[in-house]
UniProtKB/Swiss-Prot annotation:
The active site is at K76, S151, S175. The lineage of its organism: Bacteria, Pseudomonadati, Pseudomonadota, Betaproteobacteria, Neisseriales. This is Glutamyl-tRNA(Gln) amidotransferase subunit A. One of its GO terms (molecular function) is ATP binding. It holds the Pfam family Amidase. It comes from Neisseria meningitidis serogroup C (strain 053442). One of its GO terms (biological process) is translation. It catalyses: L-glutamyl-tRNA(Gln) + L-glutamine + ATP + H2O = L-glutaminyl-tRNA(Gln) + L-glutamate + ADP + phosphate + H(+).
Length: 481
């Protein structure tokens, strides 16, 4: 029962061939068996899950269910939900029980979705391996010696391991797309402002965006329909008419113009990634799409620009964690200033501290113009590059990551780890939508994904193209043993 896609489970629930309680119970049993080794979930509450499932069954019986009623979903630990611990995988918030619910979570609860639990992540979403968690690393379900990617590694791992039909992630510099690639699932980062950020703990406010993660593009489209929408509680939420993100699922690929950025197809990619890209290019050509070479010249500069800006925003956002009102507080201190220092030294992990220090430095007097202001100018140039390309094509095809998932504990420097985000970061700098879908496997049997990038508000077109690729391939149907 846990092998169904979201769409398949929805059909069975609506036709009463299975009940929401049966479906939730099957997932809870699978989680109890497999999660201790995987470490994808860090909070489970069976009583709450089954209570939501019973309510969903009542709604289905009364005939007022939606396509998502009774479908279980996992939430990255960054989303607040009343009565659930929302720790952001940090010691700082290990004892924080949320008193309110994020708008995007509430939207899914209103549809009758059933909460399975909270998934592991890099602390405060800072990282791309899921090793920076207070609760320990999540394993890649395809090979437990490898990372699942990050920061939404727990969400990607539980969907790939069939411990959830769908999950929510957040994407600041690739945190939905990169773990989706490493775990062999589909995930989309929508246009900035499409999904409310209210109740999603902030890392870098001008980059963060929530998105769905599932087995297929069709499942992601169904989820995004429920997730997206204007929210007056979020000042960056976009006031637009409600969209149907499933509307282009049946649009053929014939005639679609796909750009191939030459900067993304260079020597930095492993042979496995280039093979996955070629698989996708061959499929697109066979379906009648037109492929053209394009250029995104600021690609290499996107990494320093991103890490300056995101760290600056993080240092500001994380200043609220000081031990005064909630979260961890140092046990022994002499005065208020010492309490602040000890609390933050004890509560934050090393990567979070590193980014706070970088951010504080680039915002400090004498360095603001040299770093922060220059990075903002670069951000605009990156966005302009994309607009030049989208004048010539409908979508961009690119790698998601330069390699398949690295090993847990790989001896990489912070800079080497940051460089692995080279193909995802520019999308966040520009605020564009982008989706990752499975496109092959490495020689070692690890999944490899590719990325479809669209212009602002082109989610339906991206999802439609991804769905057509998945109708003509079976990479998304593969699952770990």
């Amino acid at each position: 029962m846990t092998q169904y896609t979201l769409k398949q489970a929805s059909v069975l629930l609506q036709s009463k061939q299975i009940s929401a309680v049966e479906l939730a119970s099957a997932y809870l049993a699978a989680i109890a068996e497999k999660n201790p080794a995987l470490n994808g979930y860090i909070t489970i509450d069976q009583d709450k899950t089954l209570a939501e499932a019973r309510a969903a069954d009542e709604r289905i019986a009364q005939g007022n269910a939606s396509a998502l009623t009774g479908i279980p979903v996992a939430y990255k630990d960054i989303f607040c939900q009343t009565g659930w611990r929302s720790a952001c995988a940090s010691k700082m918030l290990d004892n924080f029980i949320s008193s309110y619910t994020a708008t995007v979570v509430q939207n899914l609860l209103d549809e009758g979705m059933v909460t399975l639990g909270r998934t592991n992540m890099d602390e405060f979403a800072m990282g791309s391996t899921n090793e920076n968690s207070f609760y320990g690393a999540t394993k890649n379900p395809w090979n437990p010696e490898h990372v699942p990617g990050g920061s939404s590694g727990g969400s990607a791992a539980v969907v790939a391991a069939r411990l959830a039909p769908a999950a929510l992630g957040s994407d600041t510099g690739g945190s939905i797309r990169q773990p989706a690639s490493h775990c062999g699932i589909t995930g989309i980062k929508p246009t900035y402002g499409t999904v409310s950020r209210f109740g999603m703990v902030a890392y870098a406010s001008s980059f963060d965006q929530a998105g769905p993660m599932a087995q297929t593009a069709e499942d992601c489209a169904i989820l995004l329909n429920a997730m997206a929408g204007f929210d007056p509680k979020d000042s960056t939420s976009l006031e637009r008419e409600k969209e149907d993100y499933t509307r282009d699922l049946n649009q053929p690929l014939k005639g679609l113009k796909i750009g191939l950025p030459k900067e993304y197809f260079g020597e930095g990619n492993s042979a496995d990634v280039l093979t996955a890209l070629q698989n996708t290019i061959d499929l697109l050509k066979a379906q009648g799409a037109e492929l053209i070479e394009v250029s995104l010249p600021q690609t290499k500069l996107s990494i320093p620009a991103y890490y300056v800006l995101a760290s600056a925003e993080a240092s500001t956002n994380l200043s609220r964690y000081d031990g005064v009102r909630y979260g961890h507080r140092a046990a022994q201190f002499g005065d208020l200033e010492e309490m602040y220092g000890k609390t933050r030294a004890e509560g934050f992990g090393s990567e979070v501290k590193r980014r706070i220090m970088i951010g504080t430095y680039v915002l400090s007097h004498g360095y603001y113009d040299a770093y922060y202001l220059k990075a903002q100018k670069l951000r605009r140039l990156v966005a302009d590059d994309f607009q030049t390309v989208f004048a010539r094509c409908d979508l961009i095809l690119a790698p998601t990551a330069p390699t398949a998932a690295p090993k847990i504990g790989a001896d990489s420097s912070p800079v080497e780890t940051y460089l692995s985000d080279i193909y995802t970061i520019a999308v966040n700098l520009a605020g564009l939508p982008a989706l990752t879908l499975p496109a092959g496997f490495s020689g070692g049997g690890l999944p490899v994904g590719v990325q479809l990038i669209g212009n602002y508000f082109a989610e339906a077109r991206i999802l439609g193209a991804a769905h057509q690729i998945q109708l003509n391939s079976d990479w998304h149907g593969k699952r770990p043993e």
